[in-house]
Amino acid sequence: MSTSQTLGGATRCGRIIGPSLDKIIKNAAWRKHTYLVSSCKSVLDKLESLPDDFHDPSSVVSGLAASDADSVLQPFLLSLETAYSKVVEPSLDCAFKLFSLSILRGEIQSSKQDSILFKLVNAVSKVGAIAEEPIQLAVLRVLLAAVRSPCILIRGDCLLHVVKTCYNIYLGGLSGTTQICAKSVLAQMMLVIFTRSEEDSLDVSVKTIYVNELLTFTDKSVNEGSSVYFCQGFVNEVMAAGQGSPLPPPDVIQILLQNPETETVMTPDSPSFRGYVANGEGDSETGDMSKVRQDAFLLFKNLCKLSMRFSSKENNDDQIMVRGKTLSLELLKVIIDNGGSVWRTNESFINAVKQYLCLSLLKNSAVSIMSIFQLQCAIFMSLLSKLRSVLKAEIGIFFPMIVLRVLENVLQPSYLQKMTVLNLLDKMSQDPQLMVDIFVNYDCDVESSNILERIVNGLLKTALGPPTGSSTTLSPAQDSTFRNDSVKCLVNLAKAMGNWMDQQLKVNETVWPKGSQVYASMDSNASQISELEGTISDCDSQPDTSNPEAYDASMLEQRRAYKIELQKGISLFNRKPSKGVEFLISTKKIGSSPEEVASFLMKTAGLNGTVIGDYLGERDELPLKVMHAYVDSFNFEKKDFVEAIRFFLRGFRLPGEAQKIDRIMEKFAEHYWKCNPGSFTSADTAYVLAYSVIMLNTDAHNNMVKDKMTKADFVRNNRGIDDGKDLPEEYLGSLYDRVVKEEIRMNSDTLAPQNKQVNGLNKLLGLDGILNLVSWMQPDEKPHGANGRLIRDIQEQFQAKPEKSESVYHTVTDISILRFILEVSWGPMLAAFSVTIDQSDDRLATSLCLQGFRYAVHVTAVMGMQTQRDAFVTSMAKFTNLHCAADMKQKNVDAVKAIITIAIEDGNHLHGSWEHILTCLSRIEHLQLLGEVSPSEKRYVPTKKAEVDDKKALGFPNLKKRGSFQNPSVMAVVRGGSYDSTSLVKSVPKLVTPEQIKSFIANLNLLDQIGNFELNHVYANSQRLNSEAIVSFVKALCKVSMSELQSPTDPRVFSLTKLVETAHYNMNRIRLVWSRIWNVLSDFFVSVGLSENLSVAIFVMDSLRQLSMKFLEREELANYHFQHEFLRPFVVVMQKSSSAEIRELIVRCVSQMVLSRVSNVKSGWKNVFTVFTTAALDERKNIVLLAFETIEKIVRDHFHCIIETEITVYADCIRCLITFTNSKFEGDIGFNTIEFLRFCALKLEEGGLVLNEKLKNNTISALKEDFSDTQSFTDLDEQVSYWIPLLTGLCKQVSDPRPAIRKRSIEVLFHILMDHGHLFTRPFWTGIFSSIILPVFNNIRSKTDMLFEESVDSPSSASLDTEETTWDVETSTLALQLLVDLLVKFFRSVRSQLPSVVSIIVGFIKSPFQGSTGSGISVLLHLADGLARSASEDEWREIFLALKEAASLTFAGFMKVLRTMDDIEDVETLSGQSVNIGDLDDDSLHIMSYVVSRTKKHIDVLSQIVEVVSDLYRRNQFSLSASHVDILADIFSCIASHAQQLNTDTVLRRKFKRACSVQNLTEPQLLNFENEAYKSYMMFLQDMVTCNPNVSKELDLESRLVTECAKIVKIYLKCTDPQQQEQQQRKPVLWVLPMESDRVEEATARTSLLVSSLEALCSLEAESLKKHVSSFFPLLVDLVRTEHCSPQVPYVLSNVLKSCIGPILA
């Protein structure tokens, strides 16, 4: 025989088989195994002769022909059949190699039992029964290698047999190592088989099982030290042995995977493995699946059936059965854990899970073995993770059965079961999508239980522990474990929601903008919800899932709202059924018909069966109809009577009231007899029998009934009930037996628990409302065992669910769903975290709770749920215990750290919660400050000396001082208070004790864990907050700072300092955001700046200065107003502060800022000038002087910076300067300010000249001459507009009450106009006159007019010559002179204003005030001289018409004055007698004096008007046109006529004489006035006729002259001819002047006028005289016969007659 190196020949298989055969030959017993040895030798010889490259696809052995394959493997079959371990081992080793190296190939199944491979696998399986560990391990190796081989396909029953072999090795293993290896091999086989089914391929990559995971639930006791490591290496070796072996040709694989239609997967004659499972149903379940999937399906189904085996009654404690059940469940778990998409897409696999695995879980739910329960939970978790999308209905049923039943049992739970459930929930809570899907598909499903809500409430109950006073089986350690684990689950749930939310936001970051505003509550869809009318089934309409987002956003919310309202109705029904039905009908949850209400009662889950029974038994109309409809809905046809009753009563419990039972059972009997008319004689029989059955049921199953009813008693009680006849005794006995054996009862009882737990902490945290929702007693649920009726009911539910659209599984990615989840879970989370952290000092428990708080705040904050977010943050802030530092513990410090972490991580979404966080930071700093100066403490981080000084200056106590702890503010901190109380207690009833002080100081050590870095990090991190968050942060910080500063005894500036720092940190934000921030800061600085605490106010204003200096470093672009905003607090505080120190500080701050950053100031100028304007009116002189010094520097040195900005800034500057002129402090400020205004004008002119230099083809002279309407001059107009504020300000100063200021203002105003008017355009000049110049004179005119009106209305007290009026006249005269100079200088530009100026001058002329007339005349003459060559004819006409109007208005005003003397009695004077003064009262005397004075002034005014008219005529007589002359003639004429009117009023003259005589006054010269007026008129006419005959002829002035001469002669004749005197009746006179003397005096006065008129006639030409001789000749005759007082009259008269009349007559 050849050596071992050459055994087997050159073929690949030969090299493997040869050594094994040689070893068999050596180990075999020659006598006993002769045939085996000879067979081995024969094969060895054959192998050595075979070629190496032979290929036969039909052969099962690679490299051999099909005919040789069987003979080569035959020795191994013989060796295995010997069961002799020495020859079995080499055979198994060779088989392992052949399978591992893919030498063997082909399909192995029971239908091909002649196949050598089938025989080989079967033989290997048989030797597994050998009770030797090496043999069993070798068998496991071979079977695993066969299953793993990509060239071998073990099918059907053969595969089951392989599994059974490993199964039996596990059950009968001699050692723990063997058992673990068997389990590991089985698990690895499951991976191989089901991985192939996933990919539908033989050659797949399969992961190696992890042995330690298989020992999680079972077999921990059989682990023998290094067994796990050995088994892991064992499996690894088998799996690695086949790697690298060549693959079979594709045609071989195709043959193996082919699934002929005629091939049968399962055969009736299955091996003994079928003893463990039921017979298969055939291949109808597998359909057209491939072979590998058919095998996987078969294996899965049989494993499920194996897991449903239960112990027999004879052997309840069958350990083998239990281990087999457990192993099958473990293998099912491995399969589900490693399942892929095929389980969610292949209907056969889905149905297999539903029909077999779910049934297995259902039947095992009542098993009390812990390992099985744990495996159930693990499989259930796998189903949730992998297959929840296809098992919606099943999961909805298993949740209460497996999880909630245990979770909600608080009082008497099984420790291990509950720990298993808590571990399951812990895993679930770590899968965010799973929790979301549970909520969406169950809590939002009308047909499903609120699973997530029950989970969180169950976790809350567990976290709170058993209620106080209740009995429990838990030890304190177990209870503590439950509490911690339940809290951990809630923490993980909050974390999972946050992670899911963050993930969705990251995925949809292009769709969802950041910020909590995204998660604002969705619009209500009430109109859509209202469509969900009718019964619950109406909700089962299939939603449109073509648009998932639409479903998520709208339909989900509708369904959730619908379910909540439905549950509200169900809850109301369980308390008050009638109101509940009424509510459900009104909200359209059910229809109003009895049939619909009955259907609702029958089908709706959650209704209390007892309440249903009570409602159905009511005798009211609707409940009675509903009861009838309820009963009629049952179909009792061909139903046994007891089963009918049982079926009828499964939905409700019969009421306790006999009448209600009677009504219900009467209707039941009637309906039963109607469905089964042949069952009894009448319905009465059914009624009586039903009543008897109900009583029997109560008697048999009520423990309180001691003497039970016998069958004989029952038969006897029902004699003669069938219409007098007896029912068959056998029938009644059968009824008795069935009722006694199985109780008639409801399917389930839903009793509402009543026990609730409330403690002081709940009240503190406001958790009463949350905890009141928690039921502490476990619902009285029906035991979920493996009884047939329960299984049938659940299977009916399984089958019914898919028919409803609610069974559609929804996967939601819309984060808005988190709002609904949080609404359900936030309350239990808050309660659990709060109660735990308050009651427990365990570091692990409190750390968990704080993590939960962090996660909950994150989710609620990002989702924009303000109420929930604030609740969590507030609770955390309370748990810091900073408000009661004497009781602080480590957990409170941890809470502080958590709050700081929240502030850093979720600052963007905290919004209103920032106030609580910043309050905590403030309190920390307060406590640290106290600790830093306490006797036993040193500073944690050295504070700057300045900072300490500031704090001490603001009232902080020094604890080192003796008795400092009895300081009221320190006592308040030591004694503590509620979270919302202030740190100061105004009245402390007693001193703090040394123990309290010691505890307080000791607790301050805990705060050393929180350094300044942690505190400052929150404020420094503010620069990373988004735009909305930083505004909220600043608002909150302002509130906290305000509360610090408002403390009356220990105000602090910590938050104020941090506010300033925060502003510095965020200074680089965009202006839009900064504007919003500053709106908050501005109001805060104003509030604090107005504080009564001077130190605080100074500190905040200095802080504001620092910020403003920073702001001014940033350049501001044009048309922005940010500087204006951040300087506004200075203005407000300056205007409102009552503290002179603050106002002075503001002035200094603003001065420093402006002068140091003057080039950067833009929009801030407005506030700067507003501050100085306010300072200008301050009561403190030093403030006024300080502000004026600054404004002086600004104007003098930086005027260009002002005019570079917008016009309003310059206007503010001028307004500020004007205000300084109004300062009440006398001195040079006012005058200096006015001079500065003139300086501003010079600066503006410089700006105008610069602009003019830019104009093309224009010069300064051209600008002075005229302005054209080109675009260049548009720019000039804009520049000129800067003059408006300056001129307007000076205009206002004209009305200043101080004469010197007023006069200087007028001078400067007009000097500016004179010096710089060449820059102004005509439109601008028009504006200057209308807005500035004319108002100056209007103001003066209004004053004089007012005084004049007062004097007219009350002449007795009037005085026109007061000092004020005198000054007004002087001022107005000066202004008038300057105005005329201005008009003359710029007449070309302002000639349109000539009428206005003339009107002003005329007003002066006609003014009754002393000196104004003369001033007006001189000014008018100056104007005439200045405009002599410039004014046009029309402009002269305007001047003359104004003079005429002035004269006319003078007449009217004077006549009004004269009417004031109408009430004074008129008496004729008698010569030689005195006047009795006593006849006149004081008012009359004053009136008379006033009128006399006014008459004199009136005469003077008119005389000067005549004079100015004459003067104007003389200066311009040759340039006057006819219209001008006509106006002048009218002026002379009207004045002369007025003078005659006054002089001829004898009554007036007598009154004047009387008044002047009484008061020793000179009489008004009325006569002289008349003579002078006529004389001027005559001279004017005579000169015109003589010198300007053309105009005279055009106006017929000669006729006027003759007429006026005739009038003068008549007047003279009237006073000299007695016959022409009218005789008047007079009253008695006191004294009488002789008439001759009076006439002589008047005639003498009129002589000169008469002579002038006669001479004027003589000057006429002969033709003119001849034409008018007829009119004046009679008057000459009268003059001849009149006695004259002067010889001149006859002389002139004779001359007229001789030289003029004579020639005419001749």
Swiss-Prot record:
Q: Does the keyword Transport apply?
A: yes
Q: What name does UniProt use for this protein? A: Brefeldin A-inhibited guanine nucleotide-exchange protein 4
The cross-references to Pfam families, in alphabetical order and at most eight, read: BIG2_C (PF20252), DCB (PF16213), Mon2_C (PF16206), Sec7 (PF01369), Sec7-like_HDS (PF09324), Sec7-like_HUS (PF12783)
For the keyword Cytoplasm, the answer is yes
PROSITE patterns named among the record's database cross-references: SEC7
Which gene carries the instructions for this protein?
A: BIG4
Q: How does the record say this protein sits in the membrane?
A: Peripheral membrane protein
Any single Gene Ontology cellular-component annotation: cytosol
Active-site residues annotated for this sequence: E657
Cysteines joined through disulfide linkages: none
